[in-house]
């Protein structure tokens, strides 16, 4: 019985991962492109550095979500988070917020037919 439960848990985990999408965001000049990402719980958002010195720093995030503050430059070219809590995540570049370098991630619940991950 334990083997069946373990196999079922592994299957559910792999099915959820199969639905997860990656949402790329380019970090360059004074802009995140795209500035708004629409995601589903379990998806990832991946920032890729192009030029300059920047951060991706969470501002307001849903309760229970993890904050982040990552420096991005020629030595730190990629950063990724998995969104696990539905809601709106606002973030910015600490160096260029005055120039409008901000972004938003809007996360909805599980898509139809997707099995939500459990802890």
Which residue stretches match the model-derived regions?
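Positively charged n-region of N-terminal signal peptides that target proteins for export
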Residues: 1-4
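N-terminal signal peptide c-region/cleavage motif recognized by signal peptidases
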Residues: 13-15
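Cleavable N-terminal signal peptides
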Residues: 7-8, 18
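Extracytoplasmic copper-binding redox domains, predominantly the cupredoxin/blue-copper superfamily
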Residues: 18-119
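Short, low-complexity polar/charged micro-motifs in intrinsically disordered terminal tails
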Residues: 9-11, 114-115
């Amino acid at each position: 019985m334990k083997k069946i439960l373990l196999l079922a848990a592994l299957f559910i985990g792999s099915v959820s991962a199969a639905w997860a999408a990656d949402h790329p965001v380019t970090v360059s000049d004074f802009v995140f492109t795209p500035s708004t990402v629409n995601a589903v719980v379990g998806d990832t958002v991946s920032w890729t550095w192009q030029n300059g010195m920047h951060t991706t720093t969470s501002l307001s995030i849903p309760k229970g979500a993890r904050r982040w503050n990552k420096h991005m430059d020629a030595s730190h070219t990629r950063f990724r988070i998995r969104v696990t809590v539905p809601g709106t995540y606002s973030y910015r570049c600490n160096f260029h917020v005055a120039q409008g370098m901000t972004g938003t991630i809007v996360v909805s619940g599980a898509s139809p037919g997707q099995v939500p991950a459990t802890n």
